[in-house]
A protein has these predicted regions:
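Short, conserved phosphate-binding/catalytic loop or strand-edge motifs used
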Residues: 309-319
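Catalytic palm subdomain of template-directed nucleic-acid polymerases
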Residues: 318-331
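Short, flexible loop/turn elements at secondary-structure junctions
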Residues: 39-41, 52, 67, 155, ...
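Structured, beta-strand-rich domain cores
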Residues: 1-52
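C-terminal accessory nucleic-acid interaction domains of nucleic acid-metabolism proteins
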Residues: 57-59, 67, 71-76, 80-98, ...
Length: 429
């Protein structure tokens, strides 16, 4: 945007709070304001101090970062010039006048509203960009949507062959993440991300990875969790672009789990999650019986939600939550509904926490409704042969005799979307 003849970006995004008792305006008048920031770039305790006036009589202020757990030695804001919203620098905004906000235009043309607005609409890679990816050797630099990505080991097999008899390479996963981005990014946008990495392929042990690595590109959006205890993750990736999603693929993050809360209000859930988690003796027919009972219960309650096959053995149900509810609220509500469903067919359900005590029965898991508890994101691959994908479905598809939890893969889900769309998409935002 433009303000007073200069270009302006949203350099950081988050919340602030006065750190001392009393009126913050009075603290400013007294020249000593202590406050806490919880932003995507700046976090921790800050002090704004008034110094002596300069020779012209103008006030001088000094901004200090206290030496707390959020302080990073040598961190220079000048080395992080990009907007947390657009990824652009001031110079790039100034060079793109069509992206500027104009005070002489109607307010109705503003592109960003305060609060949680619906996510933007993303365009996938061009045919030329995809052709360039296909033409790379085992590795190289790929330019996509204005960013350069250094890709490695593109011919490495990451998924064994599935029903079609063809294994899935890293190149194909990078390509999939890029082309699925317009469908997947709305579920990742403005949310901290937990990733399940399989850098050596899904037939080798994977591991959870949450902390942004030091070699991540500067333009990858990040969120600093100032509430993290020692030893916990402090810096999370926030995937909000086609290049960021493709970078995750190259990083070996083959399974993506976004938080159910959005920045900056990480304590306020936007989804309530129901997870029909099958036991060792549960059949998919058992899972469908339970999912249909949830369908009946939600219809009776007048609650809107959408089921999603997990890409492995289960079914999840995602329910949008309005403002004003806590994780305790959503967890208690999902537990109440789940116990009503479970008591209808007690022969299918166990309430035991440990899997080895469930006698092979399904668990109706309501405990994922908590901060930093996640379920696999829509359209994320799952670690199984053929690279199956977690896909939202319509309620009536629970009655489809051909439905399987791993029915769609990275090679078939785009045809599914072209034919049926995403039934969960209208509930985002």
């Amino acid at each position: 945007g433009e303000y007073g003849g200069g270009d302006v970006i949203v350099w950081d995004w988050g919340t602030w709070s006065h750190a001392k008792p009393g009126d913050p305006l009075k603290a400013i008048e007294e020249g000593d304001l202590h406050f806490d920031l919880q932003g995507q770039k700046l976090a921790g305790r800050f002090v704004l101090v008034r110094r002596d006036r300069d020779t012209s009589g103008k006030e001088q202020w000094l901004l200090l970062h206290k030496n707390d757990d959020s302080a990073v030695p040598g961190w220079d804001p000048e080395e992080h010039p990009r907007s947390v919203k657009t990824g652009l620098t001031n110079d790039e905004v100034a060079a793109a006048p069509e992206a500027l906000w104009r005070s002489d235009l109607p307010a109705g043309e503003a592109s960003v509203a305060l609060g949680h607005s619906p996510p933007p609409v993303w365009e996938g890679p061009t045919e030329e960009e995809l052709a360039a990816l296909d033409a790379l050797g085992k590795g190289g630099t790929w330019e996509v949507r204005g960013r350069e990505l250094k890709l490695t080991n593109l011919d490495k097999v990451l998924f064994p062959a599935g029903d079609d008899g063809r294994p899935v390479t890293k190149r194909e996963i990078v390509r999939y993440y890029a082309v699925i981005a317009p469908w997947m990014l709305p579920y990742l946008y403005d949310r901290p991300l937990n990733t399940h990495r399989y850098p050596n392929g899904v037939d080798k042990p994977g591991f959870w990875h949450k902390e942004v690595p030091s070699h991540a590109p500067e333009w990858l959006q990040q969120w600093h969790n100032t509430e993290a205890d020692p030893g916990e993750t402090r810096c999370y990736a926030v995937v909000d672009s086609v290049p960021a999603l493709a970078w995750m693929a190259n990083f070996g993050a083959l399974e993506l789990h976004a938080w159910t809360s959005r920045l900056p209000g990480v304590h306020q859930p936007t989804w309530a999650l129901i997870d029909v988690d099958p036991g060792t003796t549960s059949t998919f027919d058992d899972v469908l019986v339970l999912a249909r009972l949830y369908r009946t219960a939600l219809e009776h309650l007048g609650v809107v939600g959408t089921p999603k096959v997990t890409g492995q053995r289960g079914v999840q149900i995602w329910i949008p939550i309005g403002e004003g509810y806590s994780f305790s609220d959503t967890r208690a509500w999902v537990e109440k509904v789940s116990r009503a469903v479970g008591h209808t067919v007690p022969e299918l359900v166990s309430w035991q926490w440990h899997k080895d005590r469930r006698e092979g029965l399904a668990r109706l898991d309501y405990t994922q409704n908590a901060i930093n508890k996640t379920l696999v994101a829509p359209f994320s691959p799952r670690p199984a042969p053929g690279a199956p994908v977690s896909v939202p479905i319509r309620w009536d598809e629970l009655d489809d005799p051909d439905l399987r939890p791993d029915r769609w893969t990275i090679r078939t889900v785009l045809d599914r979307l072209a034919a049926a769309g995403d039934p969960l998409a209208p509930l985002i935002g």
